[in-house]
Amino acid sequence: MTSLPLGVKVEDSAFGKPAGGGSGQAPGAAAATAAAMGTDEEGAKPKVSPSLLPFSVEALMADHRKPGAKESSLAASESAQAAGGLAQPLGVPPGSLGAPDAPSSPRPLGHFSVGGLLKLPEDALVKAESPEKPERTPWMQSPRFSPPPARRLSPPACTLRKHKTNRKPRTPFTTAQLLALERKFRQKQYLSIAERAEFSSSLSLTETQVKIWFQNRRAKAKRLQEAELEKLKMAAKPMLPPAAFGLSFPLGGPAAVAAAAGASLYGASGPFQRAALPVAPVGLYTAHVGYSMYHLT
């Protein structure tokens, strides 16, 4: 309680009054007095060594070097709490502020670690490192949330056109029946009801079978007739020779053409007469001229 007024007096003497005036105390003496008072204040407080703090670097490093570090750290923490009045965290039992164990034993969770702050057990913070099967939560292990197994993609089945279930089987005609039917078809393609009934009874067939056979035979005859007509049309088309497109003669005929060519090429303008080139027979061009004139008209 005496240090506060003395400090105030020092300020008054050091800053409030000019040097060498008033109280008559020198500036050097005032500084010495202030230093002495500060020393008394520091001596009055209990000194706590940094190595005694449980969470200091020196205390943590000393645990790894000294075998009996746990007992010394506990004693140091209790003495530090008693001397300095350190506040203990709420909800923490006394004596739990000790330093961690030696490296030989697993380190307990500190109060400032993730497990200490979240109040989780040590096993919850250690992940399972099993390479065989990853750890799953209970809802993932439930078959309700598990993904369905992969299905193999099978090729789509080939869908064929199905006949009616009530379709009648095909009638197997004998050779004698087929010959009689062909003979009758050549005579008459359309049968009356009476003729069909009589003819079917003679062949031991039903009227429906004879009727369907004649219908199919008429369709086949029509297809054959159309194919024959197409062949005749292809054969009737004229095949023009290549010379018919490159030759063009005047209306005078081949003889006039040959005479005009000889007069223009071998005229009597020169002193020497040359022998005339052999002219092709007229009959060679007659067919071409007539053929081309036929198509031009």
UniProtKB/Swiss-Prot annotation:
Pfam families noted in UniProt: Homeodomain
Q: Cross-link of type Glycyl lysine isopeptide (Lys-Gly) (interchain with G-Cter in SUMO): positions? A: 9, 127
Q: What is its main location?
A: nucleus
Q: Where are the stretches annotated Disordered?
A: 1-50, 63-110, 127-157
Q: Where in the cell is it found?
A: Nucleus
Q: Where is the composition biased (Basic and acidic residues)?
A: 127-136
Regions of compositional bias (Low complexity) in chain numbering: 26-38, 71-95
Q: Which GO terms describe its cellular component?
A: nuclear periphery
In the record, biological process GO terms are:
embryonic morphogenesis; inner ear development; negative regulation of gene expression; negative regulation of odontoblast differentiation; nose development; positive regulation of cell cycle; positive regulation of odontogenesis; regulation of odontogenesis
Q: Which SMART domains match?
A: HOX
One example of the protein's molecular function in GO is:
RNA polymerase II transcription regulatory region sequence-specific DNA binding
Please tell me whether the keyword Nucleus is annotated for this protein: yes
UniProt entry keywords in alphabetical sequence: Developmental protein, DNA-binding, Homeobox, Isopeptide bond, Nucleus, Repressor, Transcription, Transcription regulation, Ubl conjugation
- DNA-binding region in chain numbering: 166-225
UniProt's post-translational modification comment states: Sumoylated by PIAS1, desumoylated by SENP1. Sumoylation of Lys-9 and Lys-127 not required for interaction with H1-5, transcriptional repression, inhibition of myoblast differentiation, or binding to gene promoters.
What InterPro entries does UniProt report for this protein, alphabetically?
A: HD, HD_metazoa, Homeobox_CS, Homeodomain-like_sf, Msh_Homeobox_Regulators
* Family stated for the protein in its record: Belongs to the Msh homeobox family.
Q: How does it assemble?
A: Interacts with CREBBP/CBP, TBP and SP1; interaction with these transcription activators may inhibit autoinactivation. Interacts (via C-terminus) with PIAS1 (via N-terminus); the interaction is required for the localization of both proteins to the nuclear periphery and specific binding of MSX1 to the core enhancer region in target gene promoters. Interacts with H1-5.
Cross-referenced PANTHER family, in alphabetical order? HOMEOBOX PROTEIN MSX, HOMEOBOX PROTEIN MSX-1
Question: What job does this protein perform?
Answer: Acts as a transcriptional repressor. Capable of transcription autoinactivation. Binds to the consensus sequence 5'-C/GTAAT-3' in downstream activin regulatory elements (DARE) in the gene promoter, thereby repressing the transcription of CGA/alpha-GSU and GNRHR. Represses transcription of myoblast differentiation factors. Binds to core enhancer regions in target gene promoters of myoblast differentiation factors with binding specificity facilitated by interaction with PIAS1.
Name-wise, this protein is Homeobox protein MSX-1
What organism is this sequence from?
A: Callimico goeldii
User: What is the gene name?
Assistant: MSX1
